[in-house]
Amino acid sequence: MTRHDATRVIRAATGTTLTAKSWLTEAPLRMLMNNLDPDVAEHPQELVVYGGIGRAARDWESFDAIVAALTRLDEDQTLLVQSGKPVGVFRTHADAPRVLIANSNLVPRWANWDHFSELDQKGLAMYGQMTAGSWIYIGAQGIVQGTYETFVEMGRQHYAGNLAGKWLFTGGLGGMGGAQPLAAVMAGASCLVVECRRSSIDMRLRTGYLDTWTDSLDEALRLIEESCTAKKPLSVGLLGNVADVLDELLLRGIKPDLLTDQTSAHDPVNGYLPQGWSVEEWDAKRVSARKEVEAAARESMANHIRAMLTFHALGVPTVDYGNNLRQMALEAGIDNAFDFPGFVPAYIRPLFCRGIGPFRWVALSGDPDDIAKTDAKVKELIPDDAHLHRWLDMAAEKIAFQGLPARICWVGLGDRHRLGLAFNAMVRSGELKAPVVIGRDHLDSGSVASPNRETEAMADGSDAVSDWPLLNALLNTASGATWVSLHHGGGVGMGFSQHAGMVIVCDGSEAADKRIERVLWNDPATGVMRHADAGYAIATDCAKEKGLDLPGILR
C-alpha cells in the first residue's frame, strides 16, 4: 500500500479527445484526476484533497486501478468503489450510474476515530470527507458562496445588512477554511484568519483567496484597523495557533465584530495543531504518538471554545462553522460548548427548506470561456434574482479557477433542472466546447444527516435520523445520476454524519436530457421533502407550490 509518492503529478485531461470509451466514463476519470491536481488538492502526493485526511483514492495502487477500470468501462457497466478502492464492475444499463461509491461507512457502534484509524492503517478504509472521495471537489470555490451567504446573513441579522468597517476573526486556511477570507471581503467585511501552516497561507495567496499575510499579531491588527477605518475590506492571514491568538485578543480587550472557525477540528489527530507545539513536532507525532496528539489537541480545542464562549458572552456574534469544534470541547469537559449556534440553524436553514443549496458545475473542456457562457445562461434563465447576479459577477471577477474551470451557484428546486437542460443544449449545439458535469457538495438540503451541522436543532428533533441521505442516494441512483456516493463522517468526523453526493454529465445527448430532468428535480426535492417532514412551513409551502407528491407529509 503506497500512500505517498513524491513522483506523482496528476492533472485532468482537457479538450475533446477521450481516454475512456464515452463521456459518461471520461467525466469521472477527469474529475478524479482534477481532485488531485496540485492547484486543487492540499496534499496531492498523499492523495489528500482537503479536510485533514480526506482522500480521492485509498492508495496509489487503488488510484491506478480506478483509472484502468474507468478507461475500459462500457456504457452499460457500473464500477463499484469501496472506500477508495475499485472492487467490482457489473453489467447494469445505459441509464444506471457509471460509478457507485461508498466511503468510510461503519456500523454505528464502531463508527469512531479509533476504530476507523485501525482500519485505515491496515489499508482497509479511506476517509472520503464529502467531495474528496466523491470526485467533485473544485477547490476553495466549492464552499465560498455558502460562506458568503452565511456572512451576508450575519450582516443582515446583526449589523442591519452592512458589514462595512466590520471585521471577522476565524481560523483555518485549508481546503474549506480557505474560502473564508474571500467570502468575507465579498460580503463587505475585513477578515483576520489564523493558520498554522505557511504552505496553506501561500496557496490561498497564490489562488487569490487571501490578500496578504504576516507572522505578527500587532501587524495583523494594524492592517485590520486601517482597512476597517477606510471601509475597504481586506483579508489578512496570520501565521500562528488560533487558540493562542484568541487568548491574546481577550487579554488585550480587542473584540472582533464576527467570530467563527474552520480549522479541521473534526479530526483531533490530523486536523488541529495543539497549543505549544510546532508543526514539525505535530507532523511527526501524528504518526508515532497519535494518542498524545489527540489528548493535546482536545485540550487546546477546549481552550479555543472557552475563548469563543467568552466573546459570545461579550456580545460578539459567534457561530460554529461545522467543524465539530463544539463537540470536541464538550467531550473535553466544556459543558456549555453549545451555547452559541451552528451556522445552518442560525443562518442557512430557510434556504434548505426551499431546496436551495450548493449547485456546481465544471467545464471538462478546460476552457474558462465555457464557464463565462454558462454564467450568462444562468442570468438569462433566472433574470430577476439580483442577489444571484451579483454573486456571479463577483465570482467572475474575484475567483481564480483551480484545476478545471468551475462555478458554484446556490439555486434550488425548479431552477437546477432548467439550468442542467440548458447546459446540455449548449453542449449539443457546440456553444460549449465539451461536456460539463453538474454536482454539489454533500452539504445540501436533503443529502445529509449531521446533528452538529446541517441537521442541528431540527424543529421535530429528528437531527440524527439518517434515513434521508440514504433515500437521497437511492433516488439519485434510480434517477440516472452518472455517479452517486454515500459517505460517513464528512465535515464533523467519524460517528457524527452520514451524507450522499451525486454528479451528472451533460454530454449533449437527448438521453442525457431525460436523466438531467429527473436527477436535478428529484435531488433538491428530497431536501424540501425532508424539511417538510420536520414541520417547516417554508418547506411545506414550497412542496405545495412545486406539486410534490408527499403522501405521508402533505395531507
Curated annotation (Swiss-Prot):
<dbReference type="InterPro" id="IPR023637">
    <property type="entry name" value="Urocanase-like"/>
</dbReference>
<protein>
    <recommendedName>
        <fullName>Urocanate hydratase</fullName>
        <ecNumber>4.2.1.49</ecNumber>
    </recommendedName>
</protein>
<feature type="binding site">
    <location>
        <begin position="175"/>
        <end position="177"/>
    </location>
    <ligand>
        <name>NAD(+)</name>
    </ligand>
</feature>
<comment type="similarity">
    <text>Belongs to the urocanase family.</text>
</comment>
<dbReference type="GO" id="GO:0016153">
    <property type="term" value="F:urocanate hydratase activity"/>
</dbReference>
<dbReference type="InterPro" id="IPR038364">
    <property type="entry name" value="Urocanase_central_sf"/>
</dbReference>
<feature type="binding site">
    <location>
        <begin position="262"/>
        <end position="266"/>
    </location>
    <ligand>
        <name>NAD(+)</name>
    </ligand>
</feature>
<keyword id="KW-0963">Cytoplasm</keyword>
<feature type="binding site">
    <location>
        <position position="321"/>
    </location>
    <ligand>
        <name>NAD(+)</name>
    </ligand>
</feature>
<dbReference type="Pfam" id="PF01175">
    <property type="entry name" value="Urocanase"/>
</dbReference>
<dbReference type="InterPro" id="IPR055351">
    <property type="entry name" value="Urocanase"/>
</dbReference>
<dbReference type="GO" id="GO:0019556">
    <property type="term" value="P:L-histidine catabolic process to glutamate and formamide"/>
</dbReference>
<comment type="pathway">
    <text>Amino-acid degradation; L-histidine degradation into L-glutamate; N-formimidoyl-L-glutamate from L-histidine: step 2/3.</text>
</comment>
<feature type="binding site">
    <location>
        <position position="491"/>
    </location>
    <ligand>
        <name>NAD(+)</name>
    </ligand>
</feature>
<dbReference type="Pfam" id="PF17392">
    <property type="entry name" value="Urocanase_C"/>
</dbReference>
<dbReference type="InterPro" id="IPR023636">
    <property type="entry name" value="Urocanase_CS"/>
</dbReference>
<dbReference type="GO" id="GO:0019557">
    <property type="term" value="P:L-histidine catabolic process to glutamate and formate"/>
</dbReference>
<feature type="binding site">
    <location>
        <begin position="51"/>
        <end position="52"/>
    </location>
    <ligand>
        <name>NAD(+)</name>
    </ligand>
</feature>
<keyword id="KW-0456">Lyase</keyword>
<keyword id="KW-0520">NAD</keyword>
<dbReference type="InterPro" id="IPR036190">
    <property type="entry name" value="Urocanase_sf"/>
</dbReference>
<dbReference type="GO" id="GO:0005737">
    <property type="term" value="C:cytoplasm"/>
</dbReference>
<dbReference type="InterPro" id="IPR035400">
    <property type="entry name" value="Urocanase_N"/>
</dbReference>
<feature type="active site">
    <location>
        <position position="409"/>
    </location>
</feature>
<dbReference type="InterPro" id="IPR035085">
    <property type="entry name" value="Urocanase_Rossmann-like"/>
</dbReference>
<feature type="binding site">
    <location>
        <position position="195"/>
    </location>
    <ligand>
        <name>NAD(+)</name>
    </ligand>
</feature>
<comment type="function">
    <text>Catalyzes the conversion of urocanate to 4-imidazolone-5-propionate.</text>
</comment>
<keyword id="KW-0369">Histidine metabolism</keyword>
<feature type="binding site">
    <location>
        <position position="129"/>
    </location>
    <ligand>
        <name>NAD(+)</name>
    </ligand>
</feature>
<dbReference type="Pfam" id="PF17391">
    <property type="entry name" value="Urocanase_N"/>
</dbReference>
<dbReference type="InterPro" id="IPR035401">
    <property type="entry name" value="Urocanase_C"/>
</dbReference>
<feature type="binding site">
    <location>
        <begin position="272"/>
        <end position="273"/>
    </location>
    <ligand>
        <name>NAD(+)</name>
    </ligand>
</feature>
